[in-house]
């Protein structure tokens, strides 16, 4: 599908208790990564998947496996976005954290939304980062999922458009 131009994204949620043999995860992750056009990971997940702790090195390994976009979420340090043209860290949007539940879901959905809209990877990640920030600043994760207007407002307030 990726080779036909479809956008396919792997955004795994590492839960070792769900694996009969957690040691098998890296091999299975690597097999799947080669089929996606974008890989999205947290720093901890990417280290499990490719054996690299440093985000830039991990992104290089991811890109070598085939995806055109590697995203490594760095928590309070922002998000690394990497393509064959280079890498940059999109800074975090500072909000008061109320509840972290749902932030990854908001990030993933917003990233898909903006990539499908044709945004360049860094712009899509900035938008996704703001969507995640919007959710963590609220109590109920499902009710906190932002509209596009709310994300754009937060980006504008942060000076991050």
Predicted feature descriptions by range:
Residues 3, 51-161:
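Conserved phosphate-binding/catalytic region of the ribokinase-like
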Residues 1-60, 77-79:
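Conserved beta-alpha-beta core of the PfkB/ribokinase-like small-molecule kinase fold
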């Amino acid at each position: 599908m990726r080779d036909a131009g479809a956008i396919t994204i792997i955004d795994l949620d590492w839960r070792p208790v769900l694996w009969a043999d957690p040691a098998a995860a890296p091999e299975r992750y690597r097999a799947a990564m080669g089929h996606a056009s974008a890989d999205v990971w947290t720093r901890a997940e990417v280290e499990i998947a490719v054996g690299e702790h440093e985000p830039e090195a991990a992104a290089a390994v991811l890109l070598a496996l085939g995806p055109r976009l590697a995203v490594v979420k760095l928590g309070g340090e922002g998000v690394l976005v990497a393509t064959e043209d280079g890498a940059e860290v999109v800074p975090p949007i500072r909000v008061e954290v109320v509840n972290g539940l749902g932030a990854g879901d908001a990030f993933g959905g917003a990233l898909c939304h903006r990539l499908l809209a044709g945004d360049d990877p860094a712009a899509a990640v900035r938008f996704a980062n703001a969507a995640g920030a919007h959710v963590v600043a609220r109590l109920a994760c499902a009710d906190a999922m932002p509209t596009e207007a709310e994300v754009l407002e937060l980006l504008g307030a942060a000076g991050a458009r």
